[in-house]
Amino acid sequence: MQDRPTAAELLRDIADLLEGDVLAAVSGPIQHQVRVAGNLARIVQRELELGREANFRERALVGDLLGAEGSTAELNAELAARLRANDDPEFARAAWPVLMAVTLDKLAIDKPGHDAYDFAGEQL
């Protein structure tokens, strides 16, 4: 979509409608389903707004850590294999801030408010 409203704005409006007027008009088990639908619309909205940048950042961070290029999935598979081997403590320490940054980016999309963890004092 090129003009306004954007897809993200439409999803926000759908979520607002579901969580406002629709939720107030229903009762019983359907209320839970309406809440879930509203939450899903908000997740997709945030994915549209933040997902591309988060994926680019993940690919760059993991690629830099590994000194490799590839798709995000390929780089993550290589990272998992290196960590699973558990034979390089220095690599594991270097991976920690990368994994935390990637996780916080994903939380910003999936569960905002849980993405504010301060891991500056964390030690591996």
Identify the function of each model-found stretch.
Residues 4, 8-16, 24, 28-30, ...:
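C-terminal amphipathic alpha-helical interaction region
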Residues 16-48:
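N-terminal interaction modules that seed assembly of large macromolecular complexes
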Residues 47-63:
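Short, charged early-sequence alpha-helical segments and their helix-coil boundaries
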